[in-house]
Design a protein with these regions (language model features):
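Central regulatory/effector-binding core of bacterial HTH transcription factors
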Residues: 1-40, 108
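Residues at or immediately flanking beta-strands
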Residues: 6-10, 101-105, 152-154
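Alpha-to-beta junction loops
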Residues: 7, 24-33, 52, 100, ...
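Short loop/turn segments at beta->alpha junctions
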Residues: 15, 69, 109-110, 128
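Short hydrophobic/charged patches on amphipathic alpha-helices used for structural packing
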Residues: 20, 24, 44, 70, ...
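Beta-alpha-beta core module
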Residues: 39-50, 65-66, 112-159
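Flexible hinge/capping segments at coil-to-helix
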Residues: 39-52, 56-78, 164-165
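Secondary-structure junction motif
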Residues: 62-63, 70, 76-98, 163-172, ...
Length: 178
């Protein structure tokens, strides 16, 4: 932005499906969305991958583990991602393979909500570690989850529009930032 002071960037946080609709209609030049969206009407490429982590309140018994497995979560109050979330579905498969039944006390579409609830001591949950960074040292601890699962984010653009040089540069800066 400092290299192009006459270019304005508008940042809006919205549900992935809303972002997809705005990009498909040409109202947005690009969007960064969760991988479970319907990609009809947009050009799609993977933007980033982050390994799933288990978020737990500071001082939680699971904090003593180096890695958390599905069986370790059995019986703990679990804050889950929304049922349509790709990562949640993959986690449910991992729990099923391990013979573990997780009964969520809360469901939410956002890792940041899980982090806030975990920091408040409500339970544990699987989160995107990038989203959890502001909570580290503020009541929340992360441990890797095994088997390795990943949050995937997609970069979407209108399919029939060529990206401008400014947009290509901006996308490059976004990729470098993550």
């Amino acid at each position: 932005m400092t290299r192009n002071p006459n270019v304005a960037v508008t940042f809006q946080a919205r549900m992935s499906s809303n972002v997809r609709d705005l990009v498909a209609s040409g109202q947005f030049d690009l969007g960064i969305v969760a991988d479970e969206i319907d990609s009809t009407g947009v050009a799609v490429e993977e933007f980033a991958r982050f390994r799933v982590a288990v978020a737990m309140p500071q001082g939680h018994p699971l904090e003593t583990l180096d890695v958390v497995h599905p069986s370790d979560l059995d019986g703990h109050r679990f804050i889950a991602l929304a049922p349509e979330d790709t990562t949640r579905r993959e986690a449910e498969e991992a729990f099923e393979r391990a013979g573990v039944t997780i009964r969520p006390v809360v469901e939410t579409p956002y890792s940041t909500t899980i982090c806030a609830m975990v920091a408040a001591g409500i339970g544990v949950g699987l989160v995107n570690p990038l989203t959890a960074e502001p909570y580290l040292g503020h009541g929340l601890v992360l441990r890797p989850f095994e088997p390795a699962l990943h949050f995937r984010t997609l970069l979407i653009t209108p399919p029939s529009r060529l990206a401008s040089r400014n947009l290509e540069e901006f996308i490059g800066h976004l990729r470098a930032a993550v």
